[in-house]
Structures are given as structure tokens and as C-alpha cells.
Amino acid sequence: MTVEIANESGVDVDELRLLDLARYVLDRMRIHPLAELSILLVDEGEMAVLHERWMDEPGPTDVLSFPMDELRPGRLDVEIDPDAEPAVLGDVVLCPAVAKQQARHAGHSTQDELELLTVHGILHLLGYDHAEEDAEREMFALQSELLTAWRADRRIAGRPGRKR
């Protein structure tokens, strides 16, 4: 999987953790190994511009997802086609400044919030949504499950702890 990250936000972020998390989620969701994903971290001004342009909403938001090729999660009982063409999953745009505010309210670190938003953004790229109550329950449960499993796997593997 090709996952690229660009931090244009001016905020110090543990980009390697976000890359590791994104790859983990794509693997767990059985997305073809040649799929491409881009993660962009921007400041509040840029996020406000994107939010208004694409969602017709004022002010910055925490995460925006821009799907490209229509990829969906694979099934565990079906092998991944090794001859399939690579596809671009899309872009996830994160705003660390907004994440910092949300993290303060949630009682955890900005990095924890950015990790949650990374999973959230990827799930949107895969077609998950939270416009309806049932869909929200499904998406948020999957989001929590993926994040919890990734953190547990990192602890078992002895990878470094969270950056605060």
C-alpha cells in the first residue's frame, strides 16, 4: 500500500504513527495492497477554505475525505486479486488545530484525536457514513474497533508509545 503524508499545518505530529495506522486500517479492511492513500495535515485557514468550498459549511472542521476510485472493503472469504490494477483510494485532510480543541474536550492527546480522525476519514473513503443513526452506530463501532486493535497490536509488538 502506498500511503503518503504531508504536514503543512505547522503543528508537530507523529506522522509515522499516522502512516502505520493508515496501513493497518487498509490491511484490516482488505483493501488491495496496491491502493494509494494521501493524508494531508493543514492549518485552520486552509481547512476553512476546503470546508466551505466542498461542504458549503463555514469555518474549519477536523477531517475531510475526498474519495477518488470507488473502493470498498474486501471480504475475508475472498482472496485479493493480485492482478488487479492499482487504485487511488483518495485523500484524508486533517486539521491538527481543530483536533487539539476536540482532544482537550475529550480528555486525551492531540495525537490520539488525530489517530481517531485518520480512521474516521479512511472509513468515509470506503463508503461509511454517519448521516443516519444506524449507519453512525456501525461506523463509530468499526472506528473504535480498528483503533483499539491497532493500539493493542502496537503494544504487543513493543512499538513506541503515543507522542503527547
Curated annotation (Swiss-Prot):
Keywords: Cytoplasm, Endonuclease, Hydrolase, Metal-binding, Nuclease, Ribosome biogenesis, rRNA processing, Zinc. One of its GO terms (cellular component) is cytoplasm. Binds 1 zinc ion. Zn(2+) binds at H120, H124, H130. Transmembrane segments: none annotated. SUPFAM superfamilies: Metalloproteases ('zincins'), catalytic domain. InterPro entries: MetalPrtase_cat_dom_sf_prd, YbeY, YbeY_CS. One of its GO terms (molecular function) is metalloendopeptidase activity. Its cofactor is Zn(2+). Its EC number is 3.1.-.-. It is found in: Cytoplasm. The keyword Metal-binding applies. GO terms for biological process: rRNA processing. Pfam families: YbeY (PF02130). Single strand-specific metallo-endoribonuclease involved in late-stage 70S ribosome quality control and in maturation of the 3' terminus of the 16S rRNA. Belongs to the endoribonuclease YbeY family. PANTHER family: ENDORIBONUCLEASE YBEY, CHLOROPLASTIC. NCBIfam families: rRNA maturation RNase YbeY. HAMAP family: Endoribonucl_YbeY. This is Endoribonuclease YbeY. The lineage of its organism: Bacteria, Bacillati, Actinomycetota, Actinomycetes, Acidothermales.
